[in-house]
């Protein structure tokens, strides 16, 4: 059943729940790899730097998706963009799970990151259509699920990899993206394009916005530094935890 949504008229609780779930599962794609880097290095017989490129390229892909795919939501049907991204994300995750060459993992990780930007469609959608009295609550729910996906994905991938190997993490993730596609296919309305400008002009407008609002520049710089520090910790932690004195036999 496809929901009919109008600006500021409220969003059904069932749709909010589904969008929240999809938000957490989508962003998780960018973070499954961080606890798995040591296992990947051993499996592909590459050094730590080559394995760490998997995490780096995933984040580079996510940045490119935010920069170049999200603006397309003003020019094209967001429903079609979201569904297309889910298909591409599922395929790239499956490719990582089946890869026998680290270079395939690099390319697929870049695509995974770029196509896992669905939360940045969902959160504005919820804000735009929620009733004024519920906007902050609903956006808070969506942001909470985003953070649960970011943090919980690392725990989940570590547990799955410990039980069935790191490749199983990506097979399950591909299945979850297929599930999200089916869920969004059934419930998302058309969400037609809202702008009539060209893609080039839309991209130029991003630069004008950045120049016009100094607080945006400050907030962006702070977020970049905080996120960089956070990523630096997690991307290196997997390698350290596979060395003494953190080995299971030494801890026990």
For each feature predicted by the language model, list its residue ranges.
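Pair of pore-lining "gating" transmembrane helices in MFS-fold secondary transporters
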Residues: 12-32, 213-229
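Paired small-residue
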Residues: 92, 103-111
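Cytoplasmic helix-loop-helix junction between adjacent transmembrane helices
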Residues: 109-144
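Residue-level signature of mid-helix packing/kink "hotspots" within the transmembrane helices
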Residues: 31, 59-67, 117, 150-151
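Helix-loop-helix hairpin linking two adjacent transmembrane segments in secondary transporters
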Residues: 104, 141-185
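Extracytoplasmic
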Residues: 18-48, 119, 233-238
């Amino acid at each position: 059943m496809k929901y009919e949504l109008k600006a500021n008229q409220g969003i059904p609780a069932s749709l909010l729940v589904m969008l929240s779930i999809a938000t957490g599962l989508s962003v998780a794609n960018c973070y499954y790899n961080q606890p798995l880097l040591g296992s990947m290095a051993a499996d592909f017989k590459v050094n730590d730097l080559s394995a760490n490129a998997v995490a780096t390229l995933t984040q580079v892909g996510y940045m490119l998706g935010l920069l170049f795919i999200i603006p397309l939501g003003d020019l094209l049907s967001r429903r079609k963009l979201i569904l297309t991204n889910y298909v591409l994300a599922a395929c790239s995750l499956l490719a990582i799970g089946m890869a026998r060459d680290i270079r395939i993992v690099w390319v697929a990780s870049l695509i995974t990151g770029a196509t896992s930007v669905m939360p940045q469609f969902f959160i504005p959608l919820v804000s735009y259509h929620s009733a004024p009295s519920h906007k902050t609550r609903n956006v808070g729910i969506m942001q909470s699920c985003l953070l649960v996906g970011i943090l919980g994905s690392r725990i989940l991938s570590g547990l799955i990899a410990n039980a069935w190997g790191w490749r199983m993490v990506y097979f399950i993730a591909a299945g979850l993206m297929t599930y999200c596609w089916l869920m969004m296919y059934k419930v998302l309305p058309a969400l037609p394009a809202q702008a009539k400008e060209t893609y080039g002009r839309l991209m130029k407008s991003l630069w004008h916005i950045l120049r016009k609002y100094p607080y945006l520049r400050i907030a962006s710089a702070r977020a970049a530094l905080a996120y960089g520090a956070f990523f630096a910790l997690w991307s290196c932690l997997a390698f350290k935890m596979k060395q003494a004195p953190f080995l299971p036999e030494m801890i026990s």
